[in-house]
């Protein structure tokens, strides 16, 4: 039983995007930007606390926010965006289909669940 693979040709670049890979690229890039936004908002808390005239957060809250900021900006944003780029490079530039799209979606779901659980642990103070 052969699976029919559908491709979309970009009108600007002429690149061919495989359907499942394109959806995974968009999903990973979107979640990456969400983590970047959350990390940027946490950076405001870090900066306002480091400003000597303001001292916005208490010490324990400051380090919790600093930890969440670092994890979101240095790990989650980079990893999700890197996966989006890898799907682009492996499927679009090499013109290949995804071998196991269901497994790829499972991996994406596990990445999202893991990153959310990690943030919950940090904000509960139990990390």
Question: Where do the protein language model's features map onto the residues?
Answer:
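N-terminal juxtamembrane segment and adjoining first transmembrane helix
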Residues: 13-27
């Amino acid at each position: 039983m052969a699976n029919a693979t559908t491709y979309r040709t970009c009108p600007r670049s002429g690149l061919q995007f495989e359907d499942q890979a394109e959806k995974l690229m968009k999903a990973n890039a979107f979640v990456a930007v969400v983590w970047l936004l959350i990390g940027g908002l946490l950076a405001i808390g870090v900066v306002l606390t480091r400003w000597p005239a303001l001292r916005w957060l208490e010490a324990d809250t400051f380090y919790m926010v600093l930890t969440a900021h670092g994890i979101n900006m240095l790990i989650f944003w980079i990893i999700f965006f890197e996966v989006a780029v890898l799907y682009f490079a492996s499927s679009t530039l090499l013109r290949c289909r995804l071998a196991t799209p269901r497994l790829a979606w499972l991996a994406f779901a596990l990445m999202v669940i893991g990153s959310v659980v990690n943030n919950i642990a940090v904000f509960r103070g139990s990390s």
